[in-house]
C-alpha cells in the first residue's frame, strides 16, 4: 500500500461510528439492528483502517465507542485469514497508527491498543513487524508515565507469548540484547507499575534459559534482592516468581544465598497479599525438586511446617468462592461445572497375579506408566475442587506432600505436635486443615504414621458425621490416602475394627446429600477398591446397592465419578460380579443411562468405558445384553468413520470427536472378552467387517484411536480369529511403522506389539514373511535404553511368540537379543503370555543349540526362578537342562549358585 496510501472517507467514518454507538444502546431493537450492520460491515475491505481511526484518532467520541471499535479491530485481526507477506499490507495503516494509542490519556484505550499490537504479533510473528520492538522500547524512555505504562502493556504480553521468538537473531541483531539491560534498569523505576512490568518481562526469559539474560544474571539477581521488600505487592510477587524460576533452571545461583532466600520465602509465604504468598509458596514445591538444596532445609523445617499448615486453613475468600454448604444433591449442575469428557483408551499390559482382574492389565502402576509417557501429569489437587483455582491452600498442601516425601521421619516428628493441636481445635477450619495435612503426608510419612493409624482411624471415621460438608469432604480424601493400611490388615479382628467401618463410612459418603461430599466419597471409595481388590467380594451386595442408589441421586457431574467407581470395582473384583443378584443391581442403572444419552453425546464416553470393564468382569453374565450393546456401539463406530470421511471432502460437515472411535472400539473389545469364542456370530453381521474398520482406525492420525484399534485387533486374534484372518497381512503392513524408534506414541506402539504377538500364535507358519521385519524392529526396541518397561515386556513376549511356530527364522538372530530378553522376561509375572514366550524361546534354542555356549547361565537362572510353568514348558525346560549337562559334561557351564542348583534339582531332577 506504500504506492497507494489509504484515503479515509469521512462519511464512512461517521456512519460506522454511529453504528458502533447504536450497538451499545440499551434499546434492544436499536442494538440488534446495529449489530446486524456490523456483521455486514465485515465485507468492507478497509474496515480495519476505519476501526483503527476510531480507536486512535476519534478523541471527540466517547471512550466506550472508541474502545468498542478497538475490540472489533482486535477480533477482526485475531480471526483474519490474511497470509504473511503481501497479504499483510492491508494492516499497514493499523500497524503505523495503533502504536500512538499507547500514549492515550485513557487507560482503557492504552490497554486495547496494546492488545491489538500483541494480537498481530502472536498471529503472524515478530518478523512481520520488526520495527515495533524498537518503537516500544523507545517509548519506555518517555517522560510521561502513561506512555511508559502503555508500552509495557504491549511488551509484557509480547514477552509472555513470544519469548522463544525474541531469543534469536533478526537481521543480525538479537532484540533481547538491548531489551534485557533496559528492563533491569527499569526494574528500579520510581513507578511501581513500571517496576512490576519490567520484572515480569525479565522472568519470561529465565524460564527459557535465555543467554541474553544469563549475560546479566548477577545484575538481575542483585536487582531482585534490592526489590525484595518493595512497597508494591505486585513487585514482591514478581521477585518471588523470579527466585522460584531461578531455583528451577539455575540452582547454582540460588545456592550461595540459600539461607537468606529461605528466610525471605518464609516471610513472604505469610504475606498479607494472597498473590505474594502463593508465589512464595511455590518455592517450597520447587526446592523439593533440587535434592542438594532441599537437604539444606533441615534447620528451617520447624518454621516451614507450621507455616504450611497455616496456609492450608481455608481463607474467608476461599469459603466465599466455595459458596454455601447446604444439602444440594437435588440442585441441577450448571453446564460450566461439568468438565469436557475425553476417552482414556486401553493399554495392553502383561498379566501379573496382582492388580485388576481383566485382560487390560496387571496393575494400575503399569497403565499409569504408559499414560505418563504419553501425557503430562495432573497437578496435586487435594479435594479436586474444579470450582477453585490453584491457591495458597492447595499449594501449601502440595508443598507439604513433596517435602514429606523428602524428609520423611524428620518432618513427621516436627509436624506431629502441630497436627495434634489442629485436629483437636474447636475451629472447624483449623481442624479441617489438620485432616488435609495428615492426608498430604501420607505418601512420604506412611511408615512412621502406621503406629498412629489405629488411633486416628476411629477419629477420622467420626468426622464423617461432621455437620460441615467441607470436613466430611477432606476426611474422605485423607481416608482414601490411608486406605491401603486398612485393606492390608491380616487379622479378622482388625479388619472388623478398621476396614469394615471404613467401607461403611465411605459408602455413606457416596450417597451424602452434599455434592462435594459425594464426589470426595466416591473418589475415595474408588481408591479403596484398588487397594482392597478381591477383599471386597463379601461386601458386594451393600456396595452395589449403594452405587445403584447413587445413580438415582447424583447430578450429571458426579455421575462421571460414579462411572469410574463402578469401572474400578469391575476391574478389581472381576468375575465375582457374575451373579444374578449383582448383575441386576449393576446393569439396571447403566442401561437407564444408556437409553437416555443420544448417539452423538460425549457423555457416552465414560459410560462406554465403564460398560467395557463391566462386560469383561461379567463374562457370560453379560450375554443377555451383548447383542443390543454391540449393535448400538457398532452403529456409532461406523457412523463416526463415515462422518470423518465426509468431512474431509465437505467443509460444511463437522468433524466428529474421535473419542467416539476410541470408546466404541474399546467397548467392542470388552464385549469380545466377555463372550469369548461365542462372539463370532455377533461380529459376522458387521457391515463393513470389523477387520476393515480396524484397518482404517489403525491408520488414524490420532494415536489414541490407533491404540484402541490394536487392542481390539489383539482381542479378535485371541477369541475370534476367523473374523480377522482375511485382513492380517494388510494390518501387519500398517503395524510396522508403530514399532519404529522413536516410538511416537508409546501406548499405541505397545498395543501394536502386543497384538503382533497374539497374531503370531494364530497365523502359525503363515506369519513367516513378517518374522524378519518384525524382529528387526523389536530387537531395536529391546536394546533401547530409553524404552518404557511395559513396552519392553510386550516386546520380549512377542519375540518369544514369533518362535512358537517359526523358530528357525528367529534362531540366527539369538545372539543379538538374548541378554536383554532374559533381563526383561524374568520380571514379567507368571501367566500364559510368559509361558508361551518361553515355549517359543525353547523352540528357538532347539534350532540353535550352539547358543547354549553363551546364554546357558542366564537361561538356568530364569528357569530356576520360574515357579509354575505349564506342563509343556516344564518338559521343554527339563530336556534343555538335561541336554546341556550331556553336551557340556556336567553343570559347571551353568555358572549357578548352590541355591539355584538346588532349585533346579528339586524341580527338574537334573
UniProtKB/Swiss-Prot annotation:
Q: Where is this region: Disordered?
A: 333-381
Q: What is one cellular component GO term in this UniProt entry?
A: nuclear periphery
Concerning InterPro entries, the annotation shows: ARM-like, ARM-type_fold, Importin_beta
Name the cystine pairs: none
Importin N-terminal domain: residues covered: 34-122
Q: Which UniProt keywords apply?
A: Cytoplasm, mRNA transport, Nucleus, Protein transport, Repeat, Transport
Give the GO molecular function terms. Answer: GTP binding; nuclear import signal receptor activity; nuclear localization sequence binding
| Sequence ranges of Polar residues compositional bias | 349-364
Q: One biological-process term from Gene Ontology? A: protein import into nucleus
Q: PANTHER family in the record, alphabetically?
A: IMPORTIN BETA
What family name appears in the similarity comment?
Answer: Belongs to the importin beta family. Importin beta-2 subfamily.
Protein name stated in the entry: Importin subunit beta-2
Q: Which organism is it from?
A: Schizosaccharomyces pombe (strain 972 / ATCC 24843)
Q: Which gene encodes it?
A: kap104
Amino acid at each position: 500500500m506504500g504506492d497507494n496510501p489509504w484515503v479515509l472517507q469521512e462519511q464512512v467514518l461517521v456512519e460506522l461510528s454511529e453504528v458502533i454507538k447504536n450497538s451499545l444502546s440499551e434499546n434492544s431493537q436499536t442494538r440488534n439492528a446495529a449489530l446486524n450492520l456490523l456483521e455486514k460491515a465485515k465485507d468492507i475491505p478497509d474496515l480495519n483502517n476505519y476501526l483503527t481511526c476510531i480507536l486512535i484518532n476519534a478523541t471527540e467520541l466517547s471512550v466506550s465507542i472508541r474502545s468498542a471499535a478497538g475490540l472489533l479491530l482486535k477480533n477482526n485481526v485475531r480471526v483474519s485469514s490474511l497470509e504473511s507477506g503481501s497479504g499483510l499490507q492491508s494492516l499497514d495503516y493499523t500497524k503505523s497508527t495503533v502504536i500512538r494509542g499507547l500514549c492515550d490519556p485513557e487507560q482503557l484505550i492504552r490497554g486495547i491498543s496494546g492488545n491489538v499490537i500483541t494480537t498481530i504479533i502472536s498471529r503472524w510473528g515478530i518478523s512481520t513487524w520488526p520495527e515495533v520492538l524498537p518503537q516500544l522500547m523507545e517509548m519506555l524512555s518517555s517522560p510521561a508515565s502513561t506512555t511508559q505504562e502503555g508500552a509495557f502493556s504491549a511488551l509484557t504480553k509480547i514477552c509472555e507469548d513470544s519469548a522463544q521468538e525474541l531469543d534469536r537473531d533478526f537481521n543480525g541483531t538479537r532484540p533481547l540484547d538491548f531489551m534485557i539491560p533496559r528492563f533491569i534498569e527499569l526494574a528500579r523505576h520510581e513507578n511501581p507499575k513500571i517496576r512490576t512490568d519490567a520484572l515480569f518481562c525479565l522472568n519470561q526469559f529465565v524460564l527459557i534459559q535465555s543467554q541474553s539474560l544469563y549475560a546479566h544474571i548477577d545484575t538481575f539477581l542483585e536487582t531482585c534482592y534490592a526489590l525484595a521488600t518493595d512497597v508494591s505487592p505486585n513487585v514482591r510477587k514478581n521477585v518471588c516468581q523470579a527466585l522460584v524460576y531461578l531455583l528451577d533452571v539455575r540452582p547454582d545461583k540460588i545456592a550461595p544465598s540459600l539461607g537468606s532466600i529461605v528466610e525471605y520465602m518464609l516471610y513472604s509465604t505469610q504475606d498479607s497479599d494472597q498473590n505474594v504468598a502463593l508465589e512464595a509458596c511455590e518455592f517450597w514445591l520447587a526446592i523439593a525438586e533440587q535434592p542438594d538444596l532441599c537437604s539444606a532445609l533441615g534447620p528451617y523445617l520447624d518454621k516451614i511446617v507450621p507455616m504450611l499448615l497455616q496456609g492450608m486453613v481455608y481463607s474467608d475468600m476461599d469459603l466465599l468462592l466455595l459458596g454455601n454448604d447446604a444439602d444440594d444433591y437435588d440442585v441441577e449442575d450448571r453446564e460450566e461445572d461439568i468438565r469436557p469428557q475425553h476417552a482414556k483408551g486401553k493399554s495392553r499390559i502383561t498379566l501379573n497375579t496382582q492388580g485388576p482382574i481383566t485382560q487390560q492389565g496387571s496393575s494400575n502402576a503399569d497403565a499409569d506408566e504408559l499414560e505418563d509417557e504419553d501425557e503430562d501429569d495432573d497437578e496435586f489437587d487435594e479435594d479436586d475442587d474444579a470450582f477453585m483455582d490453584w491457591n495458597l491452600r492447595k499449594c501449601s498442601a502440595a508443598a507439604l506432600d513433596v517435602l514429606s516425601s523428602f524428609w520423611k521421619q524428620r518432618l513427621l516428628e516436627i509436624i506431629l505436635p502441630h497436627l495434634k493441636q489442629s485436629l483437636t481445635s474447636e475451629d472447624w477450619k483449623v481442624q479441617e486443615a489438620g485432616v488435609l495435612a495428615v492426608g498430604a503426608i501420607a505418601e512420604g510419612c506412611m511408615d512412621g504414621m502406621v503406629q498412629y493409624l489405629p488411633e486416628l482411624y476411629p477419629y477420622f471415621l467420626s468426622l464423617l458425621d461432621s455437620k460441615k460438608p467441607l470436613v466430611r469432604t477432606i476426611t474422605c480424601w485423607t481416608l482414601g490416602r490411608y486406605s491401603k493400611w486398612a485393606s492390608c490388615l491380616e487379622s479378622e479382628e482388625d479388619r472388623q475394627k478398621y476396614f469394615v467401618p471404613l467401607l461403611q463410612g465411605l459408602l455413606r459418603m457416596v450417597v451424602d446429600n452434599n455434592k462435594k461430599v459425594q464426589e470426595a466419597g466416591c473418589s475415595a471409595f474408588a481408591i479403596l477398591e484398588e487397594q482392597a481388590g478381591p477383599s471386597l467380594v463379601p461386601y458386594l451386595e451393600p456396595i452395589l446397592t449403594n452405587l445403584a442408589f447413587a445413580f438415582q441421586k447424583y447430578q450429571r457431574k458426579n455421575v462421571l465419578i460414579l462411572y469410574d467407581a463402578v469401572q474400578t470395582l469391575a476391574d478389581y473384583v472381576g468375575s465375582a460380579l457374575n451373579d444374578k443378584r449383582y448383575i441386576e443391581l449393576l446393569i439396571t442403572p447403566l442401561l437407564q443411562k444408556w437409553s437416555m444419552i443420544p448417539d452423538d453425546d460425549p457423555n457416552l464416553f465414560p459410560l462406554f468405558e465403564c460398560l467395557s470393564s463391566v462386560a469383561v468382569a461379567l463374562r457370560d453374565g453379560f450375554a443377555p445384553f451383548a447383542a443390543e450393546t454391540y449393535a448400538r456401539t457398532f452403529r456409532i463406530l461406523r457412523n463416526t468413520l463415515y462422518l470423518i470421511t465426509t468431512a474431509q471432502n465437505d467443509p460444511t460437515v463437522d468433524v466428529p470427536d474421535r473419542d467416539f472411535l476410541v470408546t466404541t472400539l474399546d467397548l467392542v473389545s470388552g464385549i469380545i472378552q466377555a463372550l469369548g469364542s461365542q462372539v463370532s456370530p455377533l461380529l459376522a453381521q458387521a457391515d463393513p467387517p470389523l477387520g476393515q474398520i480396524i484397518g482404517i482406525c489403525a491408520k488414524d492420525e490420532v494415536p489414541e484411536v490407533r491404540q484402541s484399534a490394536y487392542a481390539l485387533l489383539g482381542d479378535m486374534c485371541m477369541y475370534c480369529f476367523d473374523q480377522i484372518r482375511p485382513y492380517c497381512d494388510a494390518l501387519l503392513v500398517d503395524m510396522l511403522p508403530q514399532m519404529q524408534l522413536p516410538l511416537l506414541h508409546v501406548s499405541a506402539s505397545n498395543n501394536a506389539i502386543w497384538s503382533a504377538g497374539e497374531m503370531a500364535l494364530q497365523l502359525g507358519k503363515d506369519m513367516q514373511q513378517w518374522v524378519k521385519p518384525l524382529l528387526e524392529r523389536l530387537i531395536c526396541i529391546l536394546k533401547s535404553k530409553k524404552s518404557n518397561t511395559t513396552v519392553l515386556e510386550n516386546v520380549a513376549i512377542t519375540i518369544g511368540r514369533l518362535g512358537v511356530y517359526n523358530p528357525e527364522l528367529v534362531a540366527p538372530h539369538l545372539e543379538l537379543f538374548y541378554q536383554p530378553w532374559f533381563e526383561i522376561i524374568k520380571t514379567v509375572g507368571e501367566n500364559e503370555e510368559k509361558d508361551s514366550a518361553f515355549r517359543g524361546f525353547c523352540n528357538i534354542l532347539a534350532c540353535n543349540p550352539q547358543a547354549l555356549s553363551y546364554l546357558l547361565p542366564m537361561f538356568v537362572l530364569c528357569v530356576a526362578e520360574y515357579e509354575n510353568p505349564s506342563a509343556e514348558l516344564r518338559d521343554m525346560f527339563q530336556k534343555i537342562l538335561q541336554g546341556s549337562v550331556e553336551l557340556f559334561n556336567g553343570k559347571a557351564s551353568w555358572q549357578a549358585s548352590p541355591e539355584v542348583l538346588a532349585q533346579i534339582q528339586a524341580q527338574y531332577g537334573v
